[in-house]
Amino acid sequence: MSRAHGSPRSFFPVGNPFRVMFPGGAHLSRKLQELLASYEDALALSLRKLKPEAASDVLTLSWMRLAVDCLSELHTNIANLITDLELPVSDWDDKWVDIYLNSSVKLLDICIALSSELSRLDQGQLLLQYALHVLGSESGVPSQEQLKRAEPSLREWMELVGVRCPRLVSCSATLQELAGNLSLMKVKNSVKGKVLMRALYGIESVTVFVCSIFVAVLSGSPKPLVELHVPEKFGWSQAFNDLHTAVSEELTRQLAGGSVAAVKELEEVEACAKRLHVLASTSQLEEEAANLANAVSHTEEEVMSDSIVQEGDHHCGLKLADDTTRECEVVISESIAEEGTHEAEMKKDISYEKGVAMVERISYEEHQDSNVKQANGSSDESALVVPERTSVQESKEELLNCISSMSKSAEGLRHGLDSLSKRVGDFFQIVLTGRDALLCNLRISDAASKVAEVSS
């Protein structure tokens, strides 16, 4: 029946694109056209939002949060579309139900794996917070004892982030399976069914690709990335293919080295933790060297002091012996008065001169030993203390800067992980709610069918 003259123009000014999308004579009503166009426009807009200015931004927690928000919005939209289509579950083909239930349960498994990994990384924050708490000091510079207490926590945290999560490794095979099963199912005798399958193909393609990015980034491996190319007949194909090309090339390049910690916020904290570990070890070695030098200097002083005391005792002994000899000579000279007073006085003068000479010699030697001690002490101080003080001061400044950087990076990582974990949990609930709603409607439909059979 031909269209009457003056009737309204077509909704599409350059022809109906859905004739290409739905070959075989399937015609969409204006309502269905508007529903599908609105859904696919929103899908294309979300994909354009996900395309970062720099491809490396997909390695950040902030981009991952944006991606989960987009997925949540798209899955909410598909639920609304199913409602607006007014397509009861009783009219669904068994294959449609199987596709939806199979893909949704695998998607839930992936969400659980992602949540588990984020939770594991978040628990590691306790180790970082403890280490930073131990390193905190009113004077600013942590002591050697504080460094020793913090070192095991830093080492344990680095070991934790260096381990690949087994659940994420298993997700790679699941994602590849989902990507391999993606196809636009042929639907006969149901225009609404064709719209539904087209919408499901779009959301599954985007979900699988985004989830593969998450798994690749968190596992530090490009293997989970799926290879997809959406045909041009889909209105959102250009946005999807542009995002896929940019992100896949960048991730493959970034993850080629096999680094486990691929998230930028995580890498920043790890770099600070490694540097802090090195500085703590260096500071410990420097302090041990300084203590050893001080011990050697103290030992030398004690040995020198003991030597001087022993030499002084020896000289005093000589002096005492000489005085005793002199007294004996005086007694003998006095007892032999018959030999002459002049000879006795000569002996007395000679003995006195010997005593004076001995005292002068001892005084001179002690003065020389004192000069040697002062010279050695000054040389040791200039050789050990001054250079060490400069080296230790530089190490302490670098240590404080590293602690400050790690504190800021750890705080950013904590907020990022908490926010992303919450969003992944919300997305899990959206998928689970949609799946439960379908199962509930199936049970109601089956019950109604059985009642109808009994009634008939």
UniProtKB/Swiss-Prot annotation:
InterPro entries: ROH1-like. One of its GO terms (cellular component) is membrane. It comes from the Eukaryota. It is found in: Membrane. The chain crosses the membrane at residues 205-221. The keyword Membrane applies. Keywords: Membrane, Transmembrane, Transmembrane helix. It is a single-pass membrane protein. Belongs to the ROH1 family. This is UPF0496 protein 4. The lineage of its organism: Eukaryota, Viridiplantae, Streptophyta, Embryophyta, Tracheophyta.
